Design a protein with these regions (language model features):
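Metal-dependent nuclease catalytic cores that hydrolyze phosphodiester bonds in DNA/RNA
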Residues: 1-159
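Mg2+/Mn2+-dependent nuclease catalytic core
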Residues: 146-257
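Acidic, carboxylate-rich catalytic segments that either coordinate divalent cations
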Residues: 261
Length: 261
């Protein structure tokens, strides 16, 4: 397990990321031309890197996300004006690009919020999301030694960077969403979130039992959180779902970096 990265500028989602067999992040690599670039599957095969948990999960279909993207594109088409003489293809392209910017803005806000939370666990720097989260954790899981942004590599051939976990096997993941105040926590979660936490737990040696918590932070009201504790009996289900997906990922990519291979 590797120490956390404290730099906000380097605080990025682990999606599309790679790790070496010691759990060290290998998000970028210096190419033959001496220029640093993003690590590719070809690089991973050469150096025996493993994919991140979210890279594996990314091959899943995400109907809710695709529906959200479609809605954003439709909203853009209703709010934007088509220029005189502009082709339909050009207008559609502008609408799609505008809707993508909405998603990028949301992602940037999420990254900023994650960084504030991480900094709080590193040096107790106060912020609205951190203060709300630590109050919840101290109440429900007292006397824990929390580790923020620790990375790992599993012998099964995957790795990851965990938002927060304790040495006793409590795994916490932070998500940012809009307008969550009037929604039940159970309405905010998907099996994918449970799979992510179970994969982290398994990768850290908690194969059969782990406490898993998804904490949602409102992007517009960052001091408001909604917390969902996963049922214990769903851990084995989500673990097996992830492992099945991992096997599929290896077949699709024609690459198995596991130490059991």
């Amino acid at each position: 397990m590797k120490d956390n990265n404290l730099s906000y500028s380097n605080h990025t989602s682990e999606a599309g990321h790679w790790y070496d067999q010691d759990g060290t992040p290998k998000y970028t690599i210096v190419g033959a031309n001496g220029v640093e670039r993003n690590t590719t599957l070809r690089d991973a095969k050469k150096f025996n890197y493993v994919p991140s948990v979210t890279s594996v999960l990314d091959i899943l279909a995400k109907p809710s996300l695709e529906h959200w993207k479609l809605n954003q594109a439709l909203k853009a088409s209703m709010s934007m004006q088509r220029s005189e003489g502009e082709s339909l293809e050009s207008f559609m392209y502008r609408c799609i690009q505008d809707s993508k910017e909405i998603g990028l803005t949301a992602a940037r806000e999420g990254t900023k919020i994650h960084a504030m939370i991480e900094q709080g666990f590193v040096d107790q720097t106060s912020s609205e999301p951190y203060d709300a989260i630590i109050e919840y954790l101290d109440t429900n899981y007292p006397d824990q030694k929390w580790i923020a942004e620790g990375s790992f590599c599993s012998e099964l051939g995957y790795g990851g960077k965990i938002d927060l976990y304790s040495e006793e096997g409590i795994f916490v993941d932070f998500k940012t969403k809009d307008n969550i105040r009037d929604k039940e926590p159970s309405k905010l979660v998907y099996d994918e979130y449970g799979m992510q936490l179970s994969a982290y737990a398994q990768g850290c040696g908690f194969v059969d039992k782990a406490e898993r918590v998804s904490i949602f932070v409102d992007r517009q009201e960052v001091g408001y959180i909604s917390c969902y504790k996963w049922e214990d009996d769903t851990h084995s289900k989500h673990r097996d779902m992830f492992n099945s997906l991992l096997s599929y990922w290896k077949l699709v990519k024609n690459y198995d970096p596991s130490r059991q291979a």
